[in-house]
């Protein structure tokens, strides 16, 4: 399994310490890393895997110079395998060979299939078969699953025996934002490790180092998660646009950035709904500056809106008519702040 690009875990200074502790102090064959993707939990898992596979004697971090490190940096190490859903691959900009490759269609005239949100049973079975083969470089083999809760029930059950009795030298890294979404039988076979992510000061310094203007606004917009804030900026949300967004949506004057997907738009609207409910409850908003929010809306409208967005979240990756859904979402949001019309005399 090869990938054309590898995230640079060395660019996230807050993961070096936790990665060192996990790689050198945790002796279990199966680890469950729990943390937010926007805080760098996936990059943390990669750094742990690279430490385990580094061939420099006594290394407690990837040396970056040995053959194994070079193979890992190009995602061509034969003893490392990562299982990611097609959708996650697309979001990370990775091109992955083998069972998890995005289906681009089988010929002219055939519709392009939407990337899957699941780690498929075929990929899990193929990975299990891979674990049973000898190490190509005579050291450990590492299987990483991200996000692990993207496995469906069949795939999860297929992995159980390997988690319980892995072949000699095989280590597994399961990465999830919410470990409770995994089967209890999976969780019980892993050592769970919580990753808190960077401190607010570390997150802000890193984001400013990425060239983000008015970084505090973007960081708040991303719930304090710096990688998510960088993605927001890449999606066309600068600080000024983010501050103007709530009232523009309430007035029906907001245009989503070019290329904004339905899931991304839904996430933005859920954040606005969260903060609007906070204002209605005399609480502090989390994602938007308080002064940027429209006047408090009726609680029943906000509650209905929140439930509608939650229902959409369960299927917003399906190949529906995206422009139509976008228009509907914006109209629904505007209606939350619409004043009731007076009765005719």
Give residue ranges: language-model regions.
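Conserved P-loop NTPase nucleotide-binding/switch module
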Residues: 162
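Short N-terminal helix/helix-N-cap motif within the alpha/beta-hydrolase-1
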Residues: 153-156, 338
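Residues immediately C-terminal
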Residues: 150-151, 165, 181
